[in-house]
Amino acid sequence: MGNVFGKKIETDPGDIQYKEILEARKRYLDEQFIQDVEDELEKETPDDTGNTGVNRKSPSILNEIEIKAMSINPKDHSYPFENLVFEGGGAKGYAYSGAIKALEELGLVSQIRRFAGVSAGAMTASLLAVGYDLEEFQDIMGQDLSSIVLDAKCGILSLLPNLLTGYGWNPGNRFYNWFGELLEKKMGNKDVTFDEHYRKTGLELCIIVTNVNLMREEYCHVKTTPSMSIRTAVRMSIALPGLFQPTHYTCNGETNTYVDGGLICNYPIHCFDGWWLSMDSKDSFLEKLKALDDLQNLLDQRQRFALDQKDQAKTLGFVLYADSETDMFRFMCEKRIGVQLDPIPNTKLGRIKLKQKKDQEKAKREDRRVVMAVDEFLKVLKKHNLDKNHTINRTELEAAFKSEEFSTTSCEILFGKDCTVQNAFDLLDKEKSGEIDFRELLNFMHGTGVQLIERFLGYQRKNVDGFFDFFRTIQSAFKTNVQRAFVSPQDLDRTVGINTGHVGLTDFKLEEEDMRFVIDQGYKSTMTFLKYFAAKEELLKNADESLQKRIQSKSSTLEYEVKD
């Protein structure tokens, strides 16, 4: 053990040798990675026939829906959507411009009667609900929103005092006033309420917020909060803890604190299911809650938002995820042919994120190589453990090293180049007993794996290098885990998944190429979804019973993703 006390830190000579071998191994893996890249570039280079040698998904392995979707033109079909639901996502919300463009081209926005959203999705839902068209919406979202939402007077110097006094860095007043002006242009009143909006337009709007005092999500809607102003609800819904100060709102003599709705429910695809927000007279609170003996059952979330299968197709939802993020819908959404990412633009943000992605790919390759090398090494050790005991002596290790079944490549991956049998034995025999026992071997393999896993997770995990990283990571953790409580496998069939590529939650300062990239992703992802939706509807209409079961089973695949 090295002495960690005092000025002088002593190091175990074995640790020095171990470090040297790890460095040698890293150099070897780097060389292999470069060779892999060169090989892939060679595959991508077209030959005389124009082929690249890269395998594409062939028609023979496409399922019925995919084959049908490839022939669909969404403009030739009608769709049953009446409700739009937008997930929160910060700067990723720029992609909604592309999604709305797709819907407007097909005339679908005009048939929508109910809008809902969280955070950036709350802004989108509200602007559409009060009557902003595509061109107006794009002009609004094309602004530098960072100058609007980040309004701390003294910038970073305001951080500590604002946290202590207001529980957040940015007061959000500039956004509150700006959004009020947007509402006034369409509704004639900055503080138009949910009730006033409903009476004037006949449209319903739902904004999801988090009530900190009651520790639950709340649904701001004409039925639940008729006298609340829309801009107040949107201001609540964008209040990412730490980045923005929360909103304090008094109702019925009780003051509660509200923050970002995405903290608990970032994708409210369920909000228009069931009776809770239904404006039908039979679903009024007076009618539903008069049976007090059944009150607990009625207020259970599964009862309030119980999905009637005949109404499922009325709701269309949108989820956002950057290429580096996980999402429970992502795996299945990205199976849809046509949603694949375009090349990342050569912008400042694009270059940074592209480097991170390359580092991640490199770590994945290293992981695969080392796992294979470890497997090969253990097999050959087992074969040459002649006395079949629980230890390996030097002679047995030497025989393993010389075996044709233990390749030079695997040896160099585990021990680096030019490592002798004696060096390897000294490294493995940590206790200097003259034999390598199972625990010593396991520790070596564990050390190898930990090194790679930590490097790999370093590109997957969220770095918490400061105050804002801390709060962004908390929200991401909540979203990833809490989302499972509000969605089900059947929601896949009414969800558009939009991969925003290199643009993440807080990347508000985008260049024109970044913005165009995200908008294009929103457009093509929506169009692709509509092709699949129409294809499935056509197939179900004309299919026999066995084919109907196969088509319906495509959605149930998500159930395994939800449970994992």
Predicted regions, residues:
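Patatin-like phospholipase
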Residues: 2-118, 126-564
